[in-house]
């Protein structure tokens, strides 16, 4: 009997989930959710992931291989929605929301953390800082432990510098 149910279930095509959702400030997902929007970074698809704030147990990581030892400026894409969310801010009785997000840079056996208030930064590339990075794997981590209502994880870039 369970075999018949399994065969019947296989006849029905499962609905394909959409890869990208719309950002809905009145409903924040509890898990990382992909969004596509004009304020996100992308060459083909402007996309990012977002979720509601949490305890820090959920994180996203960006991994890259640094080709040679040297100084690198590490930047993140600030998908800024403050102006777009003004109507929500007015309804909540505030005009600005602090968006502190802490990025952790791991390389070799080193770990450094940098906290940015992304509401104070412009939309686009924002520097986390300049770091001397050895050749090899570098990991940037962003957790869901933030001061605002939500966290957005978009793009990270590494630019070789003189110092």
Q: Would you name each region that the model predicts?
A:
Residues 1-163:
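Extracytoplasmic
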């Amino acid at each position: 009997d369970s075999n018949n149910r399994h065969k019947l279930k296989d006849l029905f095509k499962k609905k394909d989930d959409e890869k990208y959702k719309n950002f809905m400030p009145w409903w924040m997902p509890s898990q990382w959710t992909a969004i596509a929007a004009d304020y996100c970074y992308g060459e083909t698809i402007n996309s990012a992931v977002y979720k509601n704030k949490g305890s820090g147990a959920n994180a996203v990581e960006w991994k890259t291989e640094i080709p040679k030892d040297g100084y690198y400026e590490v930047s993140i894409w600030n998908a800024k929605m403050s102006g777009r969310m003004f109507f929500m801010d007015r309804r909540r009785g505030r005009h600005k929301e602090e968006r502190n997000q802490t990025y952790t840079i791991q390389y070799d056996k080193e770990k450094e953390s940098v906290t940015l208030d992304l509401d104070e930064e412009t939309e686009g590339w924002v520097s986390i800082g300049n770091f001397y990075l050895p050749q090899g794997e570098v990991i940037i981590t962003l957790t869901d432990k933030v001061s605002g209502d939500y966290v957005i994880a978009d793009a990270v870039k590494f630019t070789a510098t003189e110092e």
